[in-house]
A protein has these predicted regions:
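Bacterial Sec-exported substrate-binding components of ABC uptake systems
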Residues: 3-4, 18-65, 174-207, 259, ...
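Bacterial N-terminal signal peptides
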Residues: 7-16
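Structured C-terminal subdomain patch of bacterial secreted/periplasmic proteins
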Residues: 35, 159-169, 174, 183, ...
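Short helix-initiation/N-cap motifs at beta->coil->alpha
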Residues: 38-43, 95-107, 238-245
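A short, structured surface patch at a secondary-structure boundary
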Residues: 55-112, 116, 120-124
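Alpha-helical, coiled-coil/dimerization segments enriched in small aliphatic residues
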Residues: 82-89, 95, 215-241
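Extracytoplasmic ligand-binding site segments that recognize negatively charged/polar headgroups
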Residues: 124-130, 140-171, 202-222, 266
Length: 321
């Protein structure tokens, strides 16, 4: 009887130790998560997450912003910025992460020991990180952020749309075990899209002055999908680059000037239309020229909500008669 009693006590102690010991991360018990993506060349591929990533390398400001919005900022161990002026703000958000303003080479990325790499397409070129397929083959999940390139020629890549931004947010929510947070962000986007304001039909131009060239953002990019959703039309051309003469004939009611960088770069971009050659343009003559950051209309991720609000506000301002 004594032996039975002591055996019983020993079993109770064992169960108690198990119950009081460190609890396993529930994320390790989940089934593999698979999301659709594509490689550097536009070929479809699946990215599998066997567990919630704990050491994430993010290449691109909007990717960082999206993961922070999902509540997964603490999983970011390093970030490479597309917009260097955000470094101070993002470093404050991610005090334990390494922040880079120049692309990483393959060896430097390997040294960071990431278990997941999220990045704009250009970072997966052979002279930088290498294609996502090579990382996946090594057992490291790698994902090209939706609609992050190539711009402006899509080639075989999926269209850059509102839906593609929502898909990116949803996929990151799945991968990081933050489905509810992703759904909350998407719900806010949907609510903004369903808002009742009546926007007058009008023609709109998105244009960037870059290194002596004039680039038009066409219908196959995110800005085109947003403008269509709001019942307006986007001025578009067969080629992304147009001549000064073609711009001088533009009859758009609103012109969005695309710029990279901060306040100084914004003012330089706006000054391009101060040229007397453009003073007759309807948008210029009526003061309907608006700055918009490149990052607001190319792969904005969770910042899509702010982009929608800003563009809608501009479309509602001083409607054409």
């Amino acid at each position: 009887m004594k032996k039975l009693f002591w055996c019983f006590c020993l079993l109770i102690c064992c169960f108690g130790c198990v119950a009081c010991g460190p609890q396993q991360d529930k994320s390790s018990d989940r089934q593999n998560i698979s999301v659709n993506n594509y490689n550097f060349f536009g070929d479809e591929q699946k990215v599998i997450f066997k567990q919630v990533p704990q050491r994430i390398l993010v290449c691109g400001n909007s990717g960082v912003e999206t993961l922070v919005a999902l509540g997964a900022g603490d999983k970011i161990t390093a970030a490479v910025l597309t917009e260097a002026e955000d470094k101070g703000r993002l470093q404050a958000l991610l005090p334990n992460a390494r922040i880079y303003t120049q692309p990483l080479q393959l060896e430097a990325a390997v040294a960071l020991q990431p278990d997941f790499i999220l990045g704009w397409r250009r970072y997966f070129a052979d002279n930088q990180l290498g294609d996502t397929s090579s990382w996946i083959a090594k057992g490291i999940s790698a994902y090209i952020q939706d609609a992050s390139g190539p711009v402006p020629a899509k080639g075989r890549f999926p269209a850059c749309t509102i839906a593609s931004e929502k898909r990116f947010i949803s996929n990151m929510g799945l991968a990081l075990g933050r489905q509810q947070q992703a759904q909350d962000i998407i719900q806010k986007i949907d609510s903004e899209l369903q808002a009742a304001e009546k926007i007058p039909a009008q023609k709109v131009l998105f244009v960037e002055f870059l290194n002596g060239n004039i680039e038009v953002f066409g219908n196959d990019l995110l800005c085109g999908d947003i403008i269509r959703h709001y019942g307006c039309s986007l001025a578009s051309y067969s080629a992304p680059f147009i001549s000064q003469e073609e711009l001088m004939e533009m009859q758009a009611a609103k012109i969005f000037i695309v710029y990279h960088g901060g306040e100084q770069q914004k003012q330089v971009a706006l000054a391009q239309l101060h040229n007397p050659l453009y003073k007759h343009l309807p948008a210029v003559a009526s003061g309907q020229v608006y700055p918009i950051a490149y990052k607001q209309i190319v792969a904005p991720g969770s910042d899509l909500l702010g982009t929608l609000k800003y563009i809608k506000q501009c479309l509602l301002a001083n409607p054409p008669q």
